[in-house]
Amino acid sequence: MKLHELKPAEGSRKTRNRVGRGIGSGNGKTAGKGHKGQNARSGGGVRPGFEGGQMPLFQRLPKRGFTNINRKEFAVVNLDKLNSFAEGTEVTPELLLETGVISKLKSGVKILGDGKLEKKLTVKANKFSASAKQAIEAAGGTAEVI
């Protein structure tokens, strides 16, 4: 067998249905659109969410909540990610960004307590969860809020 003889497995690829190409094709003349009406016209059809004049679902349901314009979004780092650093390292947001642990600084860095920290580190971040702070100090390191 040569490269030009390769063919996809039987039934793995369906041929495109070419509509409006003669009566014999089974999809000629009206091209599967039926006779006249809004959906038979070019650009025909209704917009998404339109229910024929009935009050649409999204308008029948109440509004909920709001978007806080002052919200802060933190880059999240779990404890198990900090094990990649050498013992005694001072872990800063800049170092985390440099090493690819986080992709963006956002509004700062928050350290969360998922996983187990096995090294003594000095961690500097904008926020710490209670469990993360406890785990860092239990490993002999320090958690410093910047």
Curated annotation (Swiss-Prot):
Query: Which ranges are annotated Basic and acidic residues under compositional bias?
Result: 1-13
Domain of life the protein comes from: Bacteria
Its family remark reads: Belongs to the universal ribosomal protein uL15 family.
GO terms for MF: rRNA binding; structural constituent of ribosome
- Protein name, per record: Large ribosomal subunit protein uL15
Residue spans with biased composition (Gly residues)? 21-31, 42-52
Where is the region Disordered? 1-54
Q: Quote the Pfam families the UniProt record gives.
A: Ribosomal_L27A
Task: Give the GO terms filed under biological process for this record.
Answer: translation
